[in-house]
Amino acid sequence: MKKTEMGRFNISPDEDSSSYSSNGDFNYSYPTKQAALKSHYVDVDPENQNFLLESNLGKKKYETDFHPGTTSFGMSVFNLSNAIVGSGILGLSYAMANTGIALFIILLTFVSIFSLYSVHLLLKTANEGGSLLYEQLGHKAYGLAGKLAASGSITMQNIGAMSSYLFIVKYELPLVIKALMNIEDTNGLWYLNGDYLVLLVSFVLILPLSLLRNLGYLGYTSGLSLLCMIFFLIVVICKKFQIPCPVEVALMANETVNGTFTQVALAALASNSTAADTCRPRYFIFNSQTVYAVPILTFSFVCHPAVLPIYEELKSRSRRRMMNVSKISFFAMFLMYLLAALFGYLTFYEHVESELLHTYSAIVGTDILLLVVRLAVLVAVTLTVPVVIFPIRSSVTHLLCPTKEFSWFRHSVITVTILAFTNLLVIFVPTIRDIFGFIGASAAAMLIFILPSAFYIKLVKKEPMRSVQKIGALCFLLSGVVVMIGSMGLIVLDWVHDASAGGH
């Protein structure tokens, strides 16, 4: 048995306590958005972590060590919140603008509850299946196909997360440079071109960090990312009371440098009856962009590959205790997402872009507070991308050459290839909305709906197929298939419609 598997379980009838062997080598959680786990095994080589497990490890022989867990309840809540929150928060106002307040709250509630239910399935499957690694559960349940499905979904989700982070660099870094250098005319300036800047940041800053064999700053990155998002939320709430409605007023005020529009004229425009209609919130909206709402929400709630490592580190671990951690974390993120979406929508209404932070620059320009937010978010995402690259590279390494010794050449080639591929996506994919939509409808749906329920049905033997629990898991799996196929189909139709409209 590998160290990445649990040796034995001692589950009480109420499943409130468990004792198992743990992975002494494991020092790194699968980051879905931000890395979630502040592990105290930071000196172990991450390249030796078995992200894509092989049934035969060849030369490597492991002994099973008992590790009781040392992370407090509160820190576990913090770590799981880190794993949940990510760049998806920037797209939630766009989702609300295309669903309406009431429909968005309904969808947000259902997605958060379903995500929490899938955590319940995952924890129970881990107890019964005897493994704390997502891919290994897939291997135990369905062999190589299950392992590849889990690894592929995690890799796709991480590539989507990387792409969204680099999209933020592409959108926001030119605005920061423009504000710091006080540049008015941007025509022909290469250093204000987002495509050039994302390449520059990727290969000058991100690549050297990604080539490291250890990420000692992992825990700091996690904390910084969550703090940046909290700061972002505070600014969104404050700006709601500073930006006039309709936003055309702010646009004219922003574009007028010679005082052409007086305050009286601006007030008259704001009182226009037609403009006032745009400042009335809508509760149910159905349009061609509504289809992106569910994928954006599922993308925003993916944290499941990080749940098991956090569970492993939890002091006095039990499934019930970990579920309490999950409930608090999901409820906190539910409130954070709802507030960010609501105040962003009530600030810009139908003018919300797919990346909320960029909307502020388009409407009101840049002030000191927004500049600080942009700098904080840019630093956070730049430091997080190398963290996300690690599990992708490890999965590729263990898939292509699991028994070979470490090679700097192979390590570097895989890293550069991953980074180059992600940069191509960021340069040629039109908007961050497409990343949120595609990854949310595919990989996120797999990780939240399909895989946990499929693993549960296969590995939890003590419950018959006709039991309420198994029937519920089966219905959950089928709902995930419907969400995936339905969302992907509608998104592709929207892409085709946009392409045909652009061609005319």
UniProtKB/Swiss-Prot annotation:
Residues 1-76, 124-158, 210-217, 312-327, 391-411, 456-470 are cytoplasmic. The gene is Slc38a2. Changing residue 228 to S: Reduces amino acid transport activity of 75%. Significantly decreases alanine transport activity. The chain crosses the membrane at residues 77-96, 103-123, 159-177, 189-209, 218-238, 291-311, 328-348, 370-390, 412-432, 435-455, 471-493. Induction: Up-regulation upon amino acid deprivation results from both increased transcription and protein stabilization. Up-regulated by TGFB1. Up-regulation by insulin and osmotic shock. Coiled coil: none annotated. This is Sodium-coupled neutral amino acid symporter 2. The lineage of its organism: Eukaryota, Metazoa, Chordata, Craniata, Vertebrata. PANTHER family: AMINO ACID TRANSPORTER, SODIUM-COUPLED NEUTRAL AMINO ACID SYMPORTER 2. GO terms for cellular component: axon; brush border; cytoplasm; dendrite; neuronal cell body; plasma membrane; sarcolemma.
